[in-house]
Amino acid sequence: MNKALQRELKLFFLIPKNIYLPISIFGIIFVIFLVLDLDNSLNYASSFIASFITIFIISENTFKDDHANGYLEQKLSESGISDIILYLLAKWIVNVFFVFMPIAAISLIFQGHEISLELFGIYVIMLSTLYFFFNLGSAISLKRNNSLNALLIIPLLIPFIILVKGIFVDGQLEPNFWFLFAYFVFASSFIFYTILQVLRIQSR
């Protein structure tokens, strides 16, 4: 795990766009909504849309560079299943700490929420769930170099969006949190496994 995590950390910090691109995309979209001076009730919508688009864009490149330089194909052909799982987990962990957490903090501040560990954790879970779903689209469209398959994933997220709205807009933490957590478990298990299998097929 340490080796995979070290590699992802090096890639994140040695490639400038990995540092500034996610927060820049989120910031630009969010500022546009602020300039439009939308009603306070739409603060959630503006931050969610900004988060949604940001995760969608960065997920397009999750496997792109590793596929282009042959690392992904080599990894899938030479490594065992456990190494591939660690490879995917390392990518997610780096994004959690350096992309999702900053976005969650900024979003909660501008939504007027107190940054409690509970809401902060829920927001990170929300972003992680989006990440897994969009990574599936990225894996499917790896050789086609388009976002069509990622767009096809979006309808699967409609119930998820309703749950998140129930938490952050309606303030109904129960039972929405547990449904949201179930969505995260589904994404981090079944969707994660599907990503793994799709990548193995793509490497043939």
How does the language model describe each region?
Residues 122-157, 203-204:
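A structural motif at transmembrane helix-loop-helix junctions in multipass membrane proteins
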Residues 163-204:
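Membrane-interfacial helix-loop-helix junctions in multi-pass membrane proteins
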Residues 15-40, 44-56, 151-164, 183-194:
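Hydrophobic alpha-helical transmembrane segments of multi-pass membrane transport/permease proteins
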Residues 98-129:
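Secretory targeting signals
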Residues 49-50, 58, 62, 92-96, ...:
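Residue-level hotspots within the lipid-embedded alpha helices of multi-pass solute transporters
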Residues 62-95:
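Helix-loop-helix units of permease transmembrane domains in multi-pass membrane transporters
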Residues 82-109, 184:
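Selective transmembrane-helix segments that form parts of the transport pathway or gating/packing helices
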Residues 1-22:
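Aromatic- and glycine-rich beta-strand/loop motifs that create alpha-glucan
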